[in-house]
Amino acid sequence: MIPHHLITLVGPTASGKTSLGVAIAAALSGEIISADSRQVYRRMDIGTGKDLSEYTLPDGSSIPYHLIDIANPGEVYDLFHWLAAFRTSYQDILNRGKTPLLVGGTGLYVETALRGDSLSNAPQNERLRKDLYNLSHEDLKDILRRYGGTPRTDIGSVRRTIRAIEIAAYYARYPEQDPWKKLNATVKTQGNEAQNSPLILCIQLPREERVRRIGERLKKRLEEGLIEEVEQLIASGVPTERLIQYGLEYRFITQHLLGELSREEMIARLEIAIRQFAKRQMTWFRGMGRRGYTLHYLDGTQSTDRLCQEALEYICLKARGQTQLTSSLS
């Protein structure tokens, strides 16, 4: 077991997080905890990029993974559910003497886990919801921004953004009940000692390479049956409005299947939306640096073997209390 009890690997979509996470886990006798808000759902495989075959190693053994395929499509499974499951999986991995690796691109989930938050489920405010229900998604996000701070839930849909406003409004009125403010005060008093700071690796890509990978991956997923996956979800009874709320692939393909978008329009809009999503992901991760976290950036244009070597070097250096890689890795 390494001294750091949790290694975190983040990065934008299409950056190769899964393959690198598996390589690191194989080297450290580790297990992967997925930090992806959509991979929790069964039968949403292609669109969420589960890539489960990558968890199988060349020798036929497999890297155990957690928080993938644990809920049914259409079921409400939000940050509160995920955090509870994360804690259970994390403790179970430690109890068995293994190394947990938190791997994913949902920044809110990652940061909530790293903060160790004990989230208080702010009560529903039906009057506020009624006032917000008819506003556009952009208007809702503008309202949320006025509260400042980090959203307490994913804001990828109207429903989730309304919930985020509901939570922000509650804690603005009752700041003494805000668990995040209590935690921030604790962090400030603890300082920034190495033993208290999480070990975070972040894959980054040049914009042109990120755009290229997103385009190639979307084409590949369409060839693998992405549209058919959404058709099967609808046929099984998953409400179309719920699929639209899941965003990106599920939103645009559902709109295409409903006749609202042609195939060409769907692909064009989806690719743009994925690019914008990847940009937002990196904005979140860079923002973590401003919020007191130290991220070690990895050049995602390198091979998985090279990235794994650098990651393991950095992990060993952190374990010895150092922060800089040797020149051989420059």
For each of these PLM feature ranges, what is it?
Residues 1-330:
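Phosphate/pyrophosphate-binding catalytic cores of soluble transferases and nucleic-acid-acting enzymes
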